[in-house]
């Protein structure tokens, strides 16, 4: 468990030039939000929905990052700064970097899209500040989403998504 934490801290440190030590990374709200999410997701998967939402609520209050307990998150997610929202059916791969004020939002279930309402981010995706990725779309591996982009269609592998 300690080795996994050190690996996670190193993955964040490799993507952020600001921290001088792993100790600094331990203070990042994004790290705490992901940690609380892991607990909330476990409770959610065990059908303890109220407790899952309670942990989620506590995490949101402490970190200004809202990750629904139902969201599926891979290894080494780095949320750099707060005010990020990740919806219930969102799926995030490994080594994804999300900057501040990002929304992985859903579409209205009444629009005919059953089940999956939120985006899927594959491995090694980077999402710029203020981006809004909406609906049951896929952002493929190594894609980059520019700051303040509004993305409503699939983004191919290695592509850059900007604008509306």
Regions found by a protein language model. Give the residues of each.
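Left-handed beta-helix
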Residues: 63, 68-69, 74-75, 80-82, ...
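Terminal amphipathic alpha-helical/low-complexity segments used for targeting or macromolecular assembly
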Residues: 1-63
